[in-house]
Design a protein with these regions (language model features):
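Conserved alpha/beta cores of soluble small-molecule-handling proteins
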Residues: 1-98
Length: 98
C-alpha cells in the first residue's frame, strides 16, 4: 500500500501529492512501455537515512532506458539529487522509492 507523502518528484520538480497526475493519453499508459527501479531507503541508528546503492540503481535505470530506446530527460546526477531531495522534503527516514 502506498503511503501519501507531502510531495512527489514529477517532471523535474517537487509537486504536492494531489497535483501529481499524468494525462490519460500518456504513451506509457497506452503502450505499457516504461522503465523503473525500486529503491529502499533505510533509517540509520545514528539518525538520518541512507538510500541503498543509489548510484547502482540509477545506472541500471539508465541502462534499461537505453535498451528500451527511451530518452532520459535528466542526468544521473539529477535523478540522484531528486531521490535525496524527495526523502528530505518529506521527512522520511525509511521508505521505498520508485
Amino acid at each position: 500500500m502506498v503511503e501519501k507523502t507531502e510531495r512527489i518528484w514529477m517532471d523535474g520538480e517537487l509537486v504536492p501529492w494531489d497535483e501529481a497526475k499524468v494525462h490519460v493519453l500518456t504513451h506509457s499508459l497506452h503502450y505499457g512501455l516504461g522503465v523503473f527501479e525500486g529503491i529502499r531507503c533505510y533509517a540509520l541508528q545514528q539518525g538520518g537515512s541512507a538510500i541503498f546503492r543509489l548510484e547502482e540503481h540509477i545506472e541500471r535505470l539508465f541502462q534499461s532506458a537505453h535498451i528500451a530506446t527511451l530518452p532520459m530527460p535528466y542526468t544521473q546526477a539529477q535523478i540522484a539529487e531528486a531521490c535525496l531531495e524527495t526523502v528530505r522534503v518529506n521527512g522520511l527516514d525509511s521508505c521505498y522509492l520508485r
